[in-house]
Every structure is written in C-alpha cells, then in structure tokens.
Amino acid sequence: IPGAIYSEDRENNVLFAEAFITTPYVFVMQKAPDSEQTLKKGMKVAIPYYYELHSQLKEMYPEVEWIQVDNASAAFHKVKEGELDALVATQLNSRYMIDHYYPNELYHFLIPGVPNASLSFAFPRGEPELKDIINKALNAIPPSEVLRLTEKWIKMPNVTIDTWDLYSEQFYIVTT
C-alpha cells in the first residue's frame, strides 16, 4: 500500500486513508558558505506536480521559474548538480535524503505561510473496505508510536549503493 501526500485533485483517482502524519514543506538548496534561506529572482525551483501548494507558491514567489517534476526524490540530484537552484519537498523526505545521500551538499529550510503536507495511505477507488481496515488500524496506534516509527525511518543506516545511478533512467525488461 503506497504512502502518498493527500490532495483534493488526487482524491479523484484514489481513496485516501486518514492522515497518519503531517510534515512541513521545505525548500532544498545547495549548501554554500553564503547560503541564504530565501529564493531569488530567476531561480529555477522544482515542485512535484501533485503538490497542491503550487499556485500558492507561484503567487508568493512570482519572480521564480517553477518547474514541475514527477517526484521530489529525483530532483535532489539535479539541485546537487546545479541543474536546479532549489526544490520543494516535505521535511521528512528532505531530512532523509539529505542525511543519507547529500549530507554536506544540500540543506533545507521551512517554507513560511503554507499548510503542512498530510501523509496517508492511498488505495484504488474500488477498495473502500481495505481503506476502512487501514483507518481502524491507524486509529489504534498511539501518536507517540507513530512519531517513534517516523524517527526510526529517518535514522535508517546509510546504504552503500548509489541509488541515483540505479534509478535515474527508466528501464524495461522484456521477456519472451
């Protein structure tokens, strides 16, 4: 069962369980001696197409060039390489990616004035029973346990393979 960021637009395609955690949105940028926690005119900033706050950010930062991407994870590498100046991600995703893959290269800072992302499980629209079962299970988990599990996920040990090289391009396996 995939976890997903809730949005009204996505609700037309899938069912969402109740949100099990919320997390702030952040900007992710290259770490530099003169790193500032602001966006500047002309910057190229990636935002996943499914983030609802896209139009709100365009109003808040009209001088920025917004580039929609399929997901935030692939955009981290583009920020590191300088192809993008920044990206919008959730704090949980950003903290994990920076700690494990870009510890001395990227940093993040909170985006002021925007609502938090609500993370929940997503289901095919034809599976309302499964959604109800998951909702009951989630409601039985104390909030302190959800926090503990989230912290455990963030502090996973470093992996030694370069997943960017593995997953940076689509590939297909054809069998006959």
Question: Model-found features: residue ranges?
Answer:
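Proline/Glycine/Serine-rich low-complexity intrinsically disordered segments
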Residues: 1-176
